[in-house]
Amino acid sequence: PKKSRYLDKFSLSILEPQMTGLFISAIERIDNGGIGSFFIEELAELENAEISYDKPVQCNADVISHLNQEQQKAVNDVLNRPSLYAIQGPPGTGKTAVLSAIAKMYTDSGKNVLVICNSHQAVNNALNKISQYKIPTIKIGNEFKTVSLNEDIIKFSTMRQYSSFKRRNRMPTGEVVGMTLCGAILNLVLHGNAFTPSIVLIDEASQIPLCFGSAIAALAGGTYVFIGDNQQMPPIFHENLETDPLSISIFEHLQKILPEEL
């Protein structure tokens, strides 16, 4: 069989084996030519993988007119479609406003947007902000975690329900789908659902462990945008791994390897 470029370069400490097969499967998918290999190379610092750029998304000046200069720069940087980008800022600096403006202009260009966060509440907050632009916005997840969502957001408990709805209804090109990180791994990585985003917006990235990098890469986004606050509560790790050098958030790791991007 073909030898992986990646699997022999990782050292695994397995204390929670339930996800092991999933992560190995994700790396193998990427190794076989799937979108995301650049991301794995960047995270693991395996090669000098340069950030690539796709055809830019057109900027709508009206959408960003209410943003300050730094926020507008972040939006415009992402509209240039880099393969990897990170936005850092403490609470109250308008990170969600930037996220929603990016989602608006991507969907206006007919491109799918995936929003993932560590918690349902963070997903709901992001989707509520995005839905103010009156664009197709969908939340997938536990129905008991949708109480705080705006009424115009379409809600599904499972990806199967969403897929069935799309088959029965003519959906516009370019929509926003939001779910938790665990939901994205189960629905889009493990089950290989057909939803393919042009961009993946990862909020609360400072709470996501670095080990989830391989699964996030397998979400097949052309652009990955990590949004976080380096002063926010870090991920919680198994007590036997608290001193491990890899027991950090994916956002903290990005700050170390790509300081010029933050």
Q: For each of these PLM feature ranges, what is it?
A:
Residues 123-125, 146-151, 233-237:
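Switch/connector loops and helix/strand junctions flanking conserved nucleotide-binding motifs
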